[in-house]
């Protein structure tokens, strides 16, 4: 079973939190708010997205790299995660 399926409830809870934070940000932009409050909300969203990314990467590394017995498949999976990390860090 894929780690994203096994951890589905936890990951969905994180995405719901992110969704709520984005909705709150949109509401903040519709009404007058201090720039600092808007920036704080954006930082909170970024932190939540980073947390989600960390959990999915951790699951991927554990399942597809550490516990992968097929060396060729492990190399393929490593290439995939490295490309994702490159695009995420840009």
From Swiss-Prot:
Protein origin, superkingdom: Bacteria
A single MF term (Gene Ontology): DNA-binding transcription repressor activity
Major site of localization recorded for this protein: cytoplasm
Alphabetical keyword list: Cytoplasm, DNA-binding, Repressor, Transcription, Transcription regulation
GO biological process, one term: negative regulation of DNA-templated transcription
Name of one Pfam family that matches: Trns_repr_metal
GO cellular component: cytoplasm; protein-DNA complex
Protein location: Cytoplasm
Task of the protein: Repressor of rcnA expression. Acts by binding specifically to the rcnA promoter in the absence of nickel and cobalt. In the presence of one of these metals, it has a weaker affinity for rcnA promoter.
Family: Belongs to the FrmR/RcnR family.
Classification via NCBIfam families: PRK15039.1
This protein's name: Transcriptional repressor RcnR
Annotated organism of origin: Salmonella typhimurium (strain LT2 / SGSC1412 / ATCC 700720)
Organism placement in taxonomy: Bacteria, Pseudomonadati, Pseudomonadota, Gammaproteobacteria, Enterobacterales
